[in-house]
Amino acid sequence: MHRKIASWGLGLVALAVCGADWLQFRGTNGASAAQDAAPPDSWDGETDFAWRADLPGKSVASPIVVKGRVIVTSSSGVNQDRLHVLAYDVETGKQIWSRQFWATGRTLTHPFSAVAAPTPTSDGNRIFAFSSSNDL
């Protein structure tokens, strides 16, 4: 099952404009604020996006932005035992790379959640993606 990622929130749109990294859940220092951002006054989720991408499986994790790349995670398979980490160009939405791993722990989740629930994080050089199956 593919999920369309049309918008990851006004903060991510603002980040694409100002070019800043967003390395963790809720951004720098967990403040949920982008410095010098100018988000739009109105938002139409059907047409107001720069690009969209198909993800393998499903995800409820927030994306992060590292060096011009949007990093997102997802999980797929009947038991959500296939874990994915994907990178897209922040400007064009073109997929740059993807990695797949097999879950080694328990993959049971609520029907509205996903094994790829935790938001990835970065130190600016490396990506750390944790899953609810306790895989890092």
Regions found by a protein language model. Give the residues of each.
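N-terminal secretory signal peptides that target proteins for export/translocation
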Residues: 1-3
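Noncatalytic, solvent-exposed loop/strand surfaces
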Residues: 19-136
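Bacterial N-terminal signal peptides
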Residues: 7-16
